[in-house]
């Protein structure tokens, strides 16, 4: 990759969302996890039960994983119970484990609480990136709250096994980019008959093992700004409905193109990273709201070089980047 980055094989540890047996799952709903012992409703048992906090994990569904952030407005307070065979009954309250053992023993054909946990639970319980591939545009969040992902179609990437050059911000930028979503879509077309095709698409996507300082500086500041903005304004809706967030994602996509297509971007005079060093979001003296507002105003000026290069993408790279950048709207 000519100065910007060196790409290589993705050797990180990746695990899939958990799988279920007989379409049943061990879940408590409407939980209040503020105390060490909390109460939740079990639909399977049709009653409320108490459980120790450390025996449960917060549960993420596809609708709760948005680009860069967990959409708390869609979070229904569901928790997954860890149905481990080596957990003694004393660890659970209200005879919950005993009840589940009886159901599992006598009613296997209609109901089962048996849970196939991730092969590497330490990945799920440690800081990680959760990638959702269930929609045309993939979404990625950084998680430190020990969420378990549901269903299959959501994947956890161990943060500790990624190359050291990949900061939290750059990893979020890559897996929320149109380039990655486009790659996943094309990979699935070619390998659609293979098992675990989503998993294979993530593992086969090359990742940087070196990124120059200018790229790192711009992407770290850019992603920090959009994460803070999305956390405060997630209820606005998708990027299509939020014009400011939409244009921030445009900037991120352009940076990722330049990371992966450095020579092509340089040859066609489409690079934006150096120009973004002068953008308002790089000003550490501004708060998040001002960074977003001033960057948007800066980008909307007709003589803005970055804006012009985004608009020229379709003509200067009609066979490559235009196809990637516009696939979602076809």
Give a label for each model feature:
Residues 1-218, 330:
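Polybasic, glycine- and aromatic-enriched phosphate-binding surface used to engage nucleic acids
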Residues 8, 92, 96-102, 209-330:
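Non-catalytic DNA-recognition/assembly elements of restriction-modification systems
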């Amino acid at each position: 990759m000519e100065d910007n980055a060196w790409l290589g094989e993705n050797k990180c540890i990746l695990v899939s969302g958990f799988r279920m047996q007989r379409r049943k799952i061990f879940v408590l709903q409407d939980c209040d996890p503020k105390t060490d012992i909390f109460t939740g409703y079990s639909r399977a048992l049709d009653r409320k039960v108490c459980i120790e906090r450390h025996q449960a994990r917060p549960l993420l569904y596809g609708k709760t994983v948005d680009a860069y952030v967990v959409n708390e407005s869609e979070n229904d307070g569901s928790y997954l119970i860890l149905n481990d065979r080596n957990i003694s009954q004393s660890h659970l309250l209200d005879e919950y484990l005993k009840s589940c053992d009886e159901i599992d023993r006598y009613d296997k054909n209609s109901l089962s609480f048996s849970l196939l946990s991730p092969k590497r639970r330490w990945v799920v319980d440690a800081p990680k990136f959760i990638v959702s591939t269930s929609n045309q545009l993939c979404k990625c969040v950084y998680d430190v709250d020990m969420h378990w992902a549901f269903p299959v179609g959501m994947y956890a990437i161990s943060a500790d096994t990624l190359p050291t050059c990949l900061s939290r911000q750059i990893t979020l930028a890559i897996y929320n980019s149109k380039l990655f979503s486009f790659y996943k879509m094309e990979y699935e077309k070619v390998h659609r008959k293979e098992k675990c095709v989503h998993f294979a698409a993530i593992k086969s996507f090359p990742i940087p093992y070196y990124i120059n300082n200018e790229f790192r500086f711009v992407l770290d500041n850019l992603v920090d700004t959009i994460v803070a903005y999305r956390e405060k304004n997630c209820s606005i809706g998708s990027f299509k409905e939020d014009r400011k967030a939409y244009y921030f994602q445009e900037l991120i996509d352009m940076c990722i193109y330049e990371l992966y297509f450095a020579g092509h971007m340089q040859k066609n005079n489409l690079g934006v990273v150096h120009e973004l060093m002068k953008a308002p979001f790089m000003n550490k003296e501004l708060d998040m709201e001002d960074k977003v507002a001033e960057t948007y105003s800066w980008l909307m000026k007709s003589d803005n070089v970055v804006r012009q290069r985004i608009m020229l993408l379709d003509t200067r790279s009609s066979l490559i980047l235009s196809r990637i950048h516009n696939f979602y709207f076809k």
